[in-house]
Amino acid sequence: MALPDFSMRQLLEAGVHFGHQTHRWNPKMTPYIFGERNNIHIIDLSQTVPLLHQALKVVSDTVGRGGRLLFVGTKRQASDIVADAARRSAQYYVNSRWLGGMLTNWKTISNSIQRLRRLDEMLSSENLGLTKKERLNLERERDKLERALGGIRDMGSTPDMMFVIDTNKEAIAVQEARRLGIPVIAVIDSNCDPDVVDYPIPGNDDAARAIALYCDLIAKAAIDGIERQQGSLGVDIGESAAAPSEPALETASAEATAEGEQPGSQA
């Protein structure tokens, strides 16, 4: 496949152009603002289009080199969408609470992931002789760790790139990535600082339809990267008898080649 296509019409229908109330703006967003309507800033989609296309190319190239992409979106309307996009594209995600040190203190996070795996093994065993209370306590611990770390349990190390919905809410995640030199792609609304990310995408970061569109495009770009990587290794995805090395690739490829879905309804 190739990089995913999108149109100005899709962006408009998803409400990508709607910013926040004018009094909430960040002056650094001035170059990306078209104007205002009813005290709401209107984002200049003529700038969003090339910047979004650039972000898709960077994602495809990074994943095509074997890089790992981390989706980050913990706000209510982004949580499920982010997780689904990451799973479809065989990538990784944080969609609950960002734990301080998730990137900068990876050793501690790795220990927690190992604990999560041990709990899974313990709870799947019938021979531990646990009481109901002991099992319940272990299940609660496992569920808590799964919510926080389930999306990165197989990542192996820090990611090679991060895609963020709402840089204000995910400020700690962005700071940690910058400290480690991890490139950040992010949707920047009219109240955000575009200078804190490497690849800004001016747009609405609150509407579920807009979030669904961004995540779908980023996921498809990652799938394109995986397929190009396998192609460069001489793997014929269409005729290979062996299963793809990425566990989610089969589902991802099928969905990516289907006709584009309409983004979800706005929150």
Curated annotation (Swiss-Prot):
Residue spans of biased composition, Low complexity class: 238-261
Gene Ontology molecular function: structural constituent of ribosome
SUPFAM superfamilies: Ribosomal protein S2 (SSF52313)
One GO BP: translation
InterPro entries: Ribosomal_uS2 (IPR001865), Ribosomal_uS2_bac/mit/plastid (IPR005706), Ribosomal_uS2_CS (IPR018130), Ribosomal_uS2_flav_dom_sf (IPR023591)
Record's keyword terms, sorted: Ribonucleoprotein, Ribosomal protein
Membership in a protein family: Belongs to the universal ribosomal protein uS2 family.
Descriptive protein name: Small ribosomal subunit protein uS2
UniProt organism field: Chelativorans sp. (strain BNC1)
